[in-house]
């Protein structure tokens, strides 16, 4: 017997209804900010996908060669694809360009709860504005989406420029700075201490104290002036703190300032944020930030950009279970006859034309078995079509929750 590939899932109808319900609510928030939906190819050139993704994600790419011997990969996330799409299609569009997407992505990693080899992301990219209010709009939209689905969460916001300013002050190379960022992202404090100790010995500097002063300070907006004082001699770090302060002026929500957010992707340049669900062990359900150099790196015009993505599967694990109301109507004849079946189809078409979901009995069941079928499908309303009733322009409406049954006029059928 064939089995689904490791790290993938089949979604049953009830699960799909729940996913569609949450998707619809999140789309409503994106649409309310006038973001436009796009989609991109499932696979892109390996060169594009690997250019600025980070070492860990690069090793997780699904890679193949096409019949023209070109190296391709399945998308591990969407930002690189959207940047390429922007260069191809939107570079002459008035700014800002506001785009969103909902699609599947692929990474070859060890499957576990909330982590799969095929997974879904829903996210947005705002391209063309470097103003703090643009960063704030993206943060606010991410927060409001999670509030729309009643998820319990905590958002942490930081700025990569703070630590980058420290690295610059101590003359660290980009590779050395990126190594430190990756260790912070993995929360490998032992590895971080080891690397900092080695750098102190090699360069005769005292960097560890400053790095941990930045990492250890967490809280509300009051931490910004505290850290500005501690980093008064670090000009770039102070500028980053002032930029973050300006962004947070436009964020009227609760948040935790956390400069330990490093993000696993190498293209972020400024403000970054992560959202953690409180239900499943505080796992990350959303992340994003500013990436001002990515489009230029892909040979486009310099274009500031900021965006985020929800891990849709993680979100589904973090919301309380709920039942999606089945609003379908089941139409069944009292007995199997060509005349009654034709009447059932007429009634079904009338209801469908008005936007209702309707199922007609296709099995020729006896009435009791048809009603049992409706119960198993959690259908609340059943229309029973009989010869005498039809001649009188009526049908029976049975409420499957209460068991009540009444005759209604066919002309009133759209009101049920």
Curated annotation (Swiss-Prot):
Enzyme class (EC, first level): ligase
Enzyme Commission identifier(s): 6.1.1.21
CDD domains: HisRS-like_core
Gene Ontology CC, one term: cytoplasm
Record keyword Coiled coil present: no
Keywords on record: Aminoacyl-tRNA synthetase, ATP-binding, Cytoplasm, Ligase, Nucleotide-binding, Protein biosynthesis
SUPFAM superfamilies, per database record: Class II aaRS ABD-related, Class II aaRS and biotin synthetases
Reactions the enzyme catalyzes: tRNA(His) + L-histidine + ATP = L-histidyl-tRNA(His) + AMP + diphosphate + H(+)
InterPro entries assigned: aa-tRNA-synth_II, aa-tRNA-synth_II/BPL/LPL, Anticodon-bd, Anticodon-bd_dom_sf, His-tRNA-ligase, HisRS-like_core, HisRS/HisZ, HisZ
GO annotation (BP), single: histidyl-tRNA aminoacylation
Disulphide linkage map: none
Top-level division of the source organism's lineage: Archaea
Compartment annotation: Cytoplasm
HAMAP family membership: His_tRNA_synth, HisZ
Name of the molecule in the record: Histidine--tRNA ligase
Protein source organism: Methanococcus maripaludis (strain DSM 14266 / JCM 13030 / NBRC 101832 / S2 / LL)
Highest classification ranks of the organism: Archaea, Methanobacteriati, Methanobacteriota, Methanomada group, Methanococci
Name of the gene encoding the protein in the UniProt record: hisS
């Amino acid at each position: 017997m064939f089995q689904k590939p490791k790290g993938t899932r089949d979604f049953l109808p009830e699960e799909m209804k729940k996913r569609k319900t949450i998707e619809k609510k999140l789309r409503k928030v994106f649409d309310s900010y006038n973001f436009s939906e796009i989609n991109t190819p499932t696979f892109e050139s390996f060169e594009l996908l690997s250019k600025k993704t980070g070492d860990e994600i690069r090793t997780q790419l699904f890679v193949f060669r096409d019949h023209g011997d070109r190296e391709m990969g399945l998308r591990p996330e969407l930002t690189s694809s959207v940047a390429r799409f922007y260069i191809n299609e939107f570079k002459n569009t008035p700014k800002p360009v506001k785009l969103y997407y909902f699609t599947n992505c692929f990474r070859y990693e060890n499957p576990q709860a909330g982590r799969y080899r095929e997974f879904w992301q829903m996210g947005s990219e705002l391209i063309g504005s470097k103003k703090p209010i643009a960063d704030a709009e993206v943060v606010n939209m991410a927060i409001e989406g999670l509030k729309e689905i009643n998820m319990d969460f905590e958002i942490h916001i930081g700025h990569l420029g703070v630590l980058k300013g420290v690295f610059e002050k101590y003359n660290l190379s980009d590779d050395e700075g990126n190594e430190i960022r990756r260790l912070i992202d993995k929360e490998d404090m032992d590895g971080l201490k080891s690397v900092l100790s080695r750098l102190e010995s090699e360069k005769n500097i005292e960097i560890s104290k400053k790095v941990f002063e930045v990492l250890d300070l967490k809280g509300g907006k009051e931490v910004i002036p505290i850290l500005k004082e501690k980093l008064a001699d670090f000009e770039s770090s102070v500028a980053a703190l002032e930029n973050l302060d300006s962004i947070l002026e436009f964020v009227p929500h609760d948040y935790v300032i956390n400069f330990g957010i490093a993000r696993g992707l190498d293209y972020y340049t400024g403000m970054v944020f992560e959202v953690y669900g409180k239900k499943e062990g505080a796992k990350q359900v959303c992340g994003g930030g500013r990436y001002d150099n990515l489009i230029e790196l892909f040979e486009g015009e310099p274009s500031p950009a900021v965006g985020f993505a929800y891990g849709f599967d993680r979100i589904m694990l973090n919301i309380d279970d709920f039942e999606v109301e089945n609003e379908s109507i089941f139409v069944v004849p009292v007995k199997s006859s060509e005349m009654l079946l034709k009447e059932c189809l007429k009634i079904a078409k009338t209801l469908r034309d008005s936007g209702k979901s309707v199922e007609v009995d296709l099995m020729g069941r006896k009435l009791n078995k048809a009603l049992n079928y409706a119960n198993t499908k959690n259908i609340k309303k059943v229309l029973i079509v009989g010869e005498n009733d039809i001649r009188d322009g009526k049908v029976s409406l049975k409420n499957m929750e209460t068991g009540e049954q009444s005759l209604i006029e066919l002309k009133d059928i759209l009101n049920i």
